Amino acid sequence: MPLSRREIRARATRFAKDFAHAHNEEADAKPFWLKFFEVFGVQARSVGSYEVHVKKLDNALGKIDFFWPRTLLVEHKSKGKDLNKAAIQAVDYLHGVKENEKPRFILVSDFARFVLYNLEEQTQTELTLDAHEIRPDGSDP
């Protein structure tokens, strides 16, 4: 059963509060993404994998932080890091992804900021995570 907008907003509020002080990629990224997907009723491990090894364009090995085949490639950085560099790194990983598994979206984040790239439409959407801007009753701020 799909979640209501109200339930998604309530979950998003809890998520934002729970991760308001997260900052370290190594320590906090996996639980962050597990809970992020739960906001939308998605069990991350049922749709994708963490730390997927791929061969980059320069033949060096890279590690995709989270990969949902045909849907999403996630690259995560510690809070305050350059998300443009993260996006370039994510695009470099595409070289090592099988053609029939290439994702529609790339999502980069540093806990506080998200940038979603739609590779098919060649658009990007930016969002800042702020628990104070999300209303648990489902209404818009």
For each feature predicted by the language model, list its residue ranges.
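Nucleic acid-processing catalytic cores of prokaryotic defense/repair systems
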Residues: M1-P141
